Amino acid sequence: MKIGTRGSKLALAQAYLTRRLLQEAHGLPEDAIEILPMSTAGDRIQDRPLSEVGGKGLFTEEIEQALKDGRIDIAVHSTKDMPTVLPEGLHLSVFLEREDPRDAFIGRSARRFMDLPQGATVGSSSLRRQALIRRLRPDIEVVMYRGNVDTRLRKLDAGEVDGTFLACAGLRRLGLADVITDLLDPSVFPPAPGQGAIGIESRIGDERIDVLLAPLAHRETQIALACERAFLGALDGSCRTPIAGLATVEGDRLSFRGMILTPDGRQAHEVTAEGVVSDAAALGTDAANRVRAMAGPHFFDGWQ
């Protein structure tokens, strides 16, 4: 089996985790599964926000082409970076058990985000995080801040900004949880749909791969992400739209909280939903329709 992945430390850590789980599930030797790192346009373009150069697809196009061509058997992704519409013939077939979905703040002087002094600078390239920062702390200057985890932490250490945000899950997978100075409450600072979950993309109808992947599917994560990605898809979510959403599963019940914001954070509309897990996708779609109705028909005009 060949696994395609981006070449960053985090992407490779996620691919190695997937390989280990496959080995454990099927008793496979390490050399039975090959990891193929690939460079993507999103990795090469570091000087502009994703919203200006093509959105989330920049991190997946080359890998998905390799999957369609049969050069790899599966692709391992951070689900929050995946578009809701995938290339024909491909699907996100399995989600691994979710890590902590919260956003982590790493502060250089103030340890807690809300304790930053007036006029402090915070680095982030995520429109959702930028909008939430401006909503909660309009006095803070938000600067565009791209690069992999190491690059962002190095910029922070160099004093370019007073703090930055990263996904808690990614830091934990890299063994860097000790750099976190504050974990944001998702009811106040809601994460991106899919944040903290590893998604495995494969070819539709590839029965051999489906059998191998089946033991890796985590029930609660699969259900939660069906709801979150339905919400995102119904709102045409991309890197151009500040959208947050988190679903939690307890037994046969699901709870969801979603939010849409303007990039300046001045307007925000929040929606909640509860129901049975079998209706996960429908709950997400309904929540999207309700929050769109709250916001009005012109909410996305001019900045999407």
From Swiss-Prot:
It comes from the Bacteria. One of its GO terms (molecular function) is hydroxymethylbilane synthase activity. Keywords: Porphyrin biosynthesis, Transferase. One of its GO terms (cellular component) is cytoplasm. The modification S-(dipyrrolylmethanemethyl)cysteine is found at C239. One of its GO terms (biological process) is protoporphyrinogen IX biosynthetic process. It catalyses: 4 porphobilinogen + H2O = hydroxymethylbilane + 4 NH4(+). Coiled coil: none annotated. Its EC number is 2.5.1.61. Pathway: Porphyrin-containing compound metabolism; protoporphyrin-IX biosynthesis; coproporphyrinogen-III from 5-aminolevulinate: step 2/4. Its cofactor is dipyrromethane. Binds 1 dipyrromethane group covalently. Gene3D superfamilies: Periplasmic binding protein-like II, Porphobilinogen deaminase, C-terminal domain. Monomer. Belongs to the HMBS family. PANTHER family: PORPHOBILINOGEN DEAMINASE. The porphobilinogen subunits are added to the dipyrromethane group. HAMAP family: Porphobil_deam (MF_00260). Tetrapolymerization of the monopyrrole PBG into the hydroxymethylbilane pre-uroporphyrinogen in several discrete steps. This is Porphobilinogen deaminase.
